[in-house]
């Protein structure tokens, strides 16, 4: 269980990092990033990546408003 939780923490860190890169305008090939993941991890990772992208874009929009 601890190994699985550690893996999810690592995947979450990577999803957040790639979302930050995307928000900065740097190219992110999400298919290359998730290419070796099994379907369960790929689905989870892509959902977290999309959530972080949305959060970072909302933050960026708020910063531009002020």
Swiss-Prot record:
Gene3D superfamilies: Glycogen synthesis protein GlgS. Pfam families: GlgS. Transmembrane segments: none annotated. GO terms for biological process: negative regulation of bacterial-type flagellum-dependent cell motility; negative regulation of single-species biofilm formation. It comes from the Bacteria. HAMAP family: GlgS. Major determinant of cell surface composition. Negatively regulates motility, adhesion and synthesis of biofilm exopolysaccharides. Belongs to the GlgS family. This is Surface composition regulator. It comes from Shigella dysenteriae serotype 1 (strain Sd197).
